[in-house]
Structures are given as structure tokens and as C-alpha cells.
Amino acid sequence: MVQAGNAIGGSISHDGSLVVVQNYEPGGIKAFDANTLELVADVPATTEDGTRSKVVGLADLSGKRFIYSLFEAGEIRITDFSDPAKPVTQRFAGGKQPYDALVTPDGRYYIAGLFGEDGLALIDLWNLDKGSRKILSGYGRGEQPLPVFKMPHLRGWSVAGGRAYLPAIGRHEVLVVDTDTWEEVDRIKVKSQPVFAMARPDGREIWVNFAFPDNGWVQVIDTVTGKVTDTLQPGRGILHMEFLSKGHEVWLSARDDNKVVIFDTATKKQIGGFDSASPSGIFFTTRAARTGF
């Protein structure tokens, strides 16, 4: 039985009662009973002119609320499913073509990456009456970006030690942003175009993978010095990484080798692995206890 259709991503409410998915076509979100998978609400992403927009960047918030972005419409919306029969939606300006988004680990901010313009859209979830605001608005101005082989995933951004580490679109850089001011404080040169910049759970390191043709490489950044300390070749087609909850191991999907490889984060050596047919995302159950997924 097909319920969600061409869902491009999903999230679960805090109480575990609802599964909500986002759709490209037709644009919108759908809520399902987590036990029966019965459709309980269908919320179209309808724009002012009556067309429907692709939905991206879906994340759970406190209660039965979900936040998401509308690509064509340039909006951010929050839908409250406290009464699934009568969902209530708030709308905010989102900038031009938001393509992905994340909620910061403390649950306070929702940040959407913008494909159609420089900068990012930020909403303070503790102060919704202030609406959205633009951050890093000058990023990329006056520079010639490289061709984009793969869009970075914002869920692969990291927040560690009061700094956010963001993959730069079309550049061989990781941006460092102060999370108090949301201003850029540094740029770290890396081997190629970053896709994921993921923090070890203790925040001491950022592990970075890259777009094709350099997707067999991984680099490690020291968050104290802001320098690349290790350059690794774990396998062919490294698409995703996930740390164990205490950070002593990282699992990497090597799609083109049909393997998942396991590295010791202290020694940077492979300590295990197993066969898997074209592995992509790796997700551990520890995510179930984190807001924004």
C-alpha cells in the first residue's frame, strides 16, 4: 500500500504519534498515524497564485509542530497538528529558492539554505513574532563560484563550541559562523566541494565528505585550530557518515564499493566494515532522541 507517494523526506512528532512526510509533486506535507499509517491530514503547499510548491527541509518541533520550506514560493511554514483534523499553519518569508534546512541542536533556530540568492534564512523559534531574517547575505558576492556537482545537505551542518560549520555551495571551503551573531568568522580550505560537514559528538572534530569527482575522500578538521588535520580515502563514493553516540567510531557508506566501512576516530584507521548493496544514508537510533530530525 502506497501512502506517502513520492515523499522526499519525513519526520516524527515528539510523542511518536505522527509520521509527517514532505512531497515534491504535488507539493505539500502529509501526516500519518504512526501505528496504523492511516492518512490523518494532507496540507498542500499552495502559493498565492494557486500553484503548489515543492517542499524541502522538513523538521519536527516541540509539540506536534513541523517546520518546512517551499522551494518555488520562497516561504517557510510551521504546521501544528495538535488537532490533526484541523491543522494550523503559520507562514514566513523564506528567501529565494530554499533548498534544504536544519534545526540547530538546541532547538532554537531553523536555518534554510538558499539556492536562488546569496545568504541563508533564519527563524528564531523562540521568537516567531520576529519572523525570518537574512544571515550571511554577502556570501559569494563578487566571487565566481565553481560548478555545483552536488548540493550540500544542511542536515550535515555542524554546531560545535559556539560555531556552525557549513559546506559552501560551489566552493572548496567550509564556512565557520558565530552562533551568537550569525556572522561569518572564518573559512577553511578543503580538498573539494563539501557535501556533509559533520561534528564528532564531542565537537572536537568536523568530518567532511565531497561531491563527485572527489567523493572517495574525507577530511578531518580540528575545531580548535580551524585546520585540516587528516585526509583519508575510506572507499569509493563516500555518500554519508554517522558517528556512534559517544563518537569513538564513525560509519561511512562507500556506495561504489558496496560496503559500509567503520573507522576509529582517534587513530583514523579502519577497524571494521561489512558488505551492503550501494549504501547511501546511515542513521542510528540515537537520532530518535534529537529534535529536528
Regions found by a protein language model. Give the residues of each.
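Predominantly soluble domains enriched in secretory-pathway, periplasmic, or organellar proteins
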Residues: 1-293
